[in-house]
Amino acid sequence: MEYNTSELCDTYIDVVDVVEPMFSNYGGCNSFGGSISTIKCFEDNGLIAEALQQDGEGKVLLVDGGGSLRRALLDASIAQLAVDNKWEGIIIYGSVRDVDALEDLDIGIQALASIPVGADENSVGELEIPVNFGGVTFLPLDHVYADNTGIILSPEPLDME
């Protein structure tokens, strides 16, 4: 489904939170949305790989990576897991790598930056907890919508009609 965050803000400005503009699109889909699943980790992508092996239909994985620009939490092989398991998108408050390969994948990916250095794979972090970045607190099962203009959050699904 295509989402237009500008139009959604025009209609739902009183019920959405708008994430501060700091993210760039790295995936092959320009817009995505769904119910969020959260991970909090720092320079370790083990939990991300584990989560993306689960069924992701209708879901967006939202990762609080502490804003680290030193290690990439997502690479092409982990992103391929998300595609294979039908995730709608991934938002990473941190970095990605394999940028050319990511843009060929049929999934939305937003992150702060790219860097070639990979992350540890020790599965250190927390799952399904509230996380806060970009001036917004994200709760598991909230709904997030993203496109090239921005990212917005709603406690309930938004009607696209």
UniProtKB/Swiss-Prot annotation:
Alphabetized InterPro entries for the sequence: RraA (IPR010203), RraA/RraA-like (IPR005493), RraA/RraA-like_sf (IPR036704), RraA_gpbac (IPR014339)
A Pfam cross-reference name: RraA-like
Q: Give the family, as the similarity comment puts it.
A: Belongs to the RraA family.
Q: Which UniProt keywords apply?
A: Cytoplasm
Q: Which domain of life is it from?
A: Bacteria
By its UniProt entry, which Gene3D superfamilies does this protein fall under? Ribonuclease E inhibitor RraA/RraA-like
Q: What is its main location?
A: cytoplasm
Q: Does the keyword Cytoplasm apply?
A: yes
Q: Record keywords: Cytoplasm included? A: yes
Task: Indicate the quaternary assembly.
Answer: Homotrimer. Binds to both RNA-binding sites in the C-terminal region of Rne and to RhlB.
User: Its function?
Assistant: Globally modulates RNA abundance by binding to RNase E (Rne) and regulating its endonucleolytic activity. Can modulate Rne action in a substrate-dependent manner by altering the composition of the degradosome. Modulates RNA-binding and helicase activities of the degradosome.
Q: Cellular component terms, GO, for this chain's entry?
A: cytoplasm
Q: What is this protein called?
A: Regulator of ribonuclease activity A
Compartments where located: Cytoplasm
One GO biological process this protein is involved in is: regulation of RNA metabolic process
Name the Gene Ontology molecular function terms of this record.
endoribonuclease inhibitor activity; enzyme binding
Q: Which gene encodes it?
A: rraA
- The species is Shewanella sediminis (strain HAW-EB3)
